[in-house]
Amino acid sequence: LVIGADGVNSWVRNQAKIKVSQHSYQQNGIVANFSTELSHQNIARQWFHRDGILALLPLSGKLVSMVWSADEEQSTRLNSLSEAEVCQQVEEASNHALGKLQLMTKPVSFPLNSVHVKNLIGPRLALIGDAAHGIHPLAGQGVNLGLRDARKLVSTIIERGARSDCGDYMLLRQYERARKENILAMEFTTDSLQKLFSNKNPTLTRLRNLGLILTNEFPLLKRRLIQHSLN
């Protein structure tokens, strides 16, 4: 059994001639790691701006990983900044929530695309992670989706027993059927959210912001959204 887990531009998938459909979000993702003055308290934070979405994701200690989904004009500007200017921009865009920031890794940018993979399997082949799907990072679900792929593939193989053929077509079809619905739902959700948050219609923007404020004010609703994301 060959497992393709080699990213959104998967060489394994291409060699297997598995069809892919994709479209560009006309945005770039800019990633970097920072050390923070204040504790992140293991909370992932996002800020929605007219020209992009900034996310700071907690790492160990006082480290965070930044993902800034920016339109092409904004990403070009950010890529031209010095290290000190990048820190200042992120501090301002995050409302100084984590205090002073220090850049730990050089910012890297990449184009953001929606990638739909027609089949998750081939002859003695299974795709997992970004090789099996490519979604917008705004919901922070790409890693979770890939981990669920891996968990389902492993559990499907284990359930068949030690003496079974792990590359058996029917076994791989069982894995594919089990994962398709969740992947399609996440692709639809992230695509819809991206369209919602990139829309600059004033009325829609006000309604969207009101929805975020109300969600933040109701802990039970937030917990349910978190649980849904984890499951």
Regions found by a protein language model. Give the residues of each.
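Short, function-defining helix-loop hinge/capping sites that tune catalysis or transport
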Residues: N14-Q15, L138, I157, T203
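Short amphipathic alpha-helical/adjacent loop interface patches that line ligand
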Residues: N9, Q27, L147-A150, R179, ...
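A generic short alpha-helical patch detector that favors 3-5-residue windows
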Residues: Q22, P58, L145, E181-A185
